[in-house]
Amino acid sequence: MLFRRKKTIMRLCRILLLTIILCLAISPAAAYTITEFCADGYAEGDGDEYFVLDGKGSLASWSVTDGEGTVSFGGESGRTVVARNGELYYQIHNSYPDLEIIDSTPKVPNAKVSKKFQMANTEDGLTLLHNGAAVQSVSWPDDVEKGNGRVHRFENGVWDTRVFKIGQSDFEPRTFTADKVTLFVSPDCSHEVITGVIKEADDTIIISMYEFTSVSLAESLADAERRGTEVTILMEGGPVGGMSKDEKGVLNYLSRAGVDIYTIESEGKLPARYRYLHTKYLVADSMVTVVISENFKDSGIPKSGSGNRGWGAAVEDSGVAKYFTEVFEDDLAGYDIYSWILGTEQFPEATESDKAVKVFKPKTITNCEVTPVISPDTSYLIGDALNNAKSSIDIQQAYISHYSDSENPWLSSAVRAAEEGAEVRIQLDGMYYNTDSEADNDEIAADVNRKGLKNLQAKILTDREGILKLHNKGFIIDDELVLISSINWNYNSPTNNREAGLLIESEEAAEYYTNVFNYDWEGVVLDNPASAAVGFDIRFILAGAVIAGLVVLYIWRRRH
């Protein structure tokens, strides 16, 4: 009996050993993968084209072919970057590859190449071989979409889960529990919140901004620099229509005050990493992060109280501040960054509107969850939030446009939520440039309303006292989730721009912005414990007078 047991144990041991040997024998077939490549680079002759192998163990038995030439390996192991020209790769990526195909620099070893290995831009393919047998293949345009500067990534068994361009970041989403968040809106109270943060900063202020022409904010930042606060600003160098004379004057003024200013922009044939730096945020003292939908302009952050409708939040949390600082530093480290060159443009004169309507005051809430949203890295969080909506969605957008080959997916998600029973309201800007063409806000609103759902409405904001235009890019979902962002609802903004936003999970935050939304929707503050003395709106006074007059007339007639 004992002998049989020993024999059985020995048999099991032999089976286990054989299984281990087989696993070791077959594991190399899955040990390496092509995880990234760029066939159409920015350097001359596509010298910066490259591919990346990821895995463990020796690469000696591995090779990559494009169907014409083959790259083989020696003693390399682990993640290995193979570029066509190491020096040109360095000029674009600011780091050298592990191997190069063309001998360009002694800093990079040469790869073993047979015949001509060069990826074609429009139609080609790569095949990974192990001991001469194919284990992975990818081709374009069949498997991935071709394009200049397109970087293709293989993650979780799928190619290109998002559009990547050379030099773009890949930040993961993180959620923080913020100690304190101050909610505010433009035009009512954004200026006081932002200047307050600037005035309280002692050590550092970093700003990432699309446009900057505000005289008062420039003066506040210059004062901060003079008192010893280190101020650094990153600007979009080529906004739509070009950088204005006033903006150049503001940046000259700040530069003379000692502020470090940089621009991100295309240069010649070398495109910037992002179509536009469209962000609007600042971080003070590595602790307070301000994210807003508005640019630093008199219309966006008005001192007088009259201007664009926009939403913002100042988050007091070191984790959120660190996250945005890392994004800022990544943006500042790219090949497309240029120091500001002092020009002759003069500091513009301050302009103030004679209309000062301040309906809403800032409101501070505590202990709420905050998730940064960064485009193009984590734009998908917006779609996820819309797809998870259950009871209500209030959307306030400067504009919504469909994609060239499909409907806007975020709008489709909102409509689908309404079809499933959620109350959905969509408010869009009514300025002429958002309503003049044949496929802009008024057509979008009409299409939404034509669906005939009582719980789905779309409106155009055309007239609210003190509001010049609707420039917001936010929503409120299920009375508990708020989006504050710079992200427009088009293809380019979430896909190609650098953008910034916040998802705030808080019933108090949702209530605050719902009150603002209701005011814009109906012209009435339904419930706003955070509002200032709302003041008297002449429209309501007149309406009340008319009603009172009718009541008096009715009573008089009854008595006579």
Predicted region positions:
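Bacterial N-terminal signal peptides
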Residues: 16-25
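A structural motif detector for short, solvent-exposed N-terminal "entry" segments of globular domains
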Residues: 30-70, 117-121, 213
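C-terminal membrane-anchoring or membrane-association module
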Residues: 549-560
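Buried hydrophobic-core signal for structured, non-transmembrane domains
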Residues: 48-56, 125-128, 151, 205
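Intrinsically disordered, low-complexity Pro/Gly/Ser/Thr-rich segments with frequent PxxP/GP/PP motifs
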Residues: 68-110
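HKD-type phospholipase D/PLD-like phosphodiesterase module
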Residues: 98, 103-116, 122-123, 131-136, ...
